[in-house]
Curated annotation (Swiss-Prot):
Protein name: Hordoindoline-A
Localisation per UniProt entry: Membrane; Secreted, Extracellular space
InterPro entries: Bifun_inhib/LTP/seed_sf (IPR036312), Bifunc_inhib/LTP/seed_store (IPR016140), Glia_glutenin (IPR001954)
PTM per Swiss-Prot/TrEMBL: Five disulfide bonds are present.
Disulfide bonds, paired cysteine numbers: none
GO CC terms in record: extracellular region; membrane
Residue ranges the record assigns to the propeptide: 20-28, 148-149
Signal peptide region: 1-19
The gene coding this protein: HINA
GO terms, molecular function: nutrient reservoir activity; toxin activity
């Protein structure tokens, strides 16, 4: 019973830390313009980017009637990447990395999140998403997001 209580308490503390971190991710410092702290669009969902980064490439638009499923799978990934790049191009450049990080953070975080090696791969892909879309330099996403221990 003690172990269950401690797990619940740990989950509560972890979710509170995650919520506080999520509030910080939405802002950025204005650079040469001297405008100070500005707000990025909060609540922006990049579902296609999230699904692409998490290897959820099945689009289910055309269910394959073929035994060559790998062709269908690859096509789904490329379609998601195209949609993701299109969505990223509509974001302010200074907000892209924060929005990318926010889109995958809930899947990587928490007590029962991804395994460590899988998390590192997803974060690396997220860092390289803007250059892959020809939309600026790589993101500086810390490789420790999602872990509280």
């Amino acid at each position: 019973m003690k172990a269950l209580f401690l797990m619940g308490l740990l989950a509560l503390v972890a979710s509170a830390a995650f919520a506080q971190y999520g509030e910080v991710v939405g802002s950025y410092e204005g650079g040469a313009g001297g405008g100070g702290a500005q707000q990025c669009p909060l609540g922006t969902k990049l579902d296609s980017c999230r699904n692409y980064l998490l290897d959820r490439c099945t689009t289910m638009k055309d269910f394959p009637v073929t035994w060559r499923w790998w062709t269908w799978w690859k096509g789904g990934c490329e379609e998601l990447l195209h949609d993701c790049c299109s969505q990223l191009s509509q974001m302010p450049p200074q907000c892209r990395c924060n929005i990318i990080q926010g889109s995958i953070q809930r899947d990587l975080g928490g007590f029962f999140g991804f395994q460590r090696d899988r998390t590192v791969k997803v974060i690396q892909a997220a860092k390289n998403l803007p250059p892959r879309c020809n939309q600026g330099p790589a993101c500086n996403i810390p490789s420790t997001i999602g872990y509280y221990w």
